[in-house]
């Protein structure tokens, strides 16, 4: 094979790889602990500064109005510099927060994963139309039950294995935010 043909094939493969991320890459970069609750054992709790605390099963979330957003997930600490691109499908976070009835003194939304990881968004940001609680990527079920999808924000805001949403009246800082990472996490 000529050097030119080799370079063309290599370039074509690289472009194909970067154009659409498969669920396999997401699986490799997000190990799911086997002992974490799944199925009927699992529920998403929404509480704190809300009028109507919620305890939602996976099935209840699946029958809520769904939306799909195209977004790119950029992990800050991924050694492979992988970018997960695609169509994320789920429920608008704002829909769930409205159902819970956010109290006026709430300033932050705290997200907790099943393994204790945390992140946060301001209440205003959390109500954006494009922020969803995703259960599918490119029409395939996510392996980690639910993931917060936050377009335009670094991956540490995209909490996977989401289990608890709490509204608080103080400036909470999540796992990485409390270590000096930007609380806004905007991708330039």
What positions do the PLM features span?
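N-terminal intrinsically disordered, low-complexity segments enriched in P/E/S/T
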Residues: 2-188
């Amino acid at each position: 094979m000529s050097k030119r043909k080799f370079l063309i094939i290599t370039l074509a493969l690289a472009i194909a790889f970067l154009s659409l991320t498969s669920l396999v890459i997401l699986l490799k970069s997000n190990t799911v602990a086997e002992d974490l609750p799944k199925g009927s054992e699992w529920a998403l709790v929404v509480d704190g500064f809300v009028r109507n605390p919620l305890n939602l099963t996976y099935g209840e979330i699946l029958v809520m109005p769904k939306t799909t957003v195209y977004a790119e997930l950029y992990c800050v600490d991924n050694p492979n510099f992988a970018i997960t691109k695609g169509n994320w499908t789920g429920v608008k976070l704002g829909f769930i927060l409205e159902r819970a009835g956010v109290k006026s003194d709430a300033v932050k939304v705290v997200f907790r994963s099943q393994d204790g990881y945390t992140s946060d968004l301001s209440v205003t940001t959390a109500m954006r139309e494009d922020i969803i609680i995703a259960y599918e990527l490119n029409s395939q079920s996510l392996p980690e039950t639910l993931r917060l999808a936050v377009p335009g924000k670094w991956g540490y805001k995209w909490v996977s294995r989401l289990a608890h949403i709490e509204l608080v009246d103080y400036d909470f800082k999540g796992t990485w935010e409390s270590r000096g990472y930007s609380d806004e996490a905007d991708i330039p």
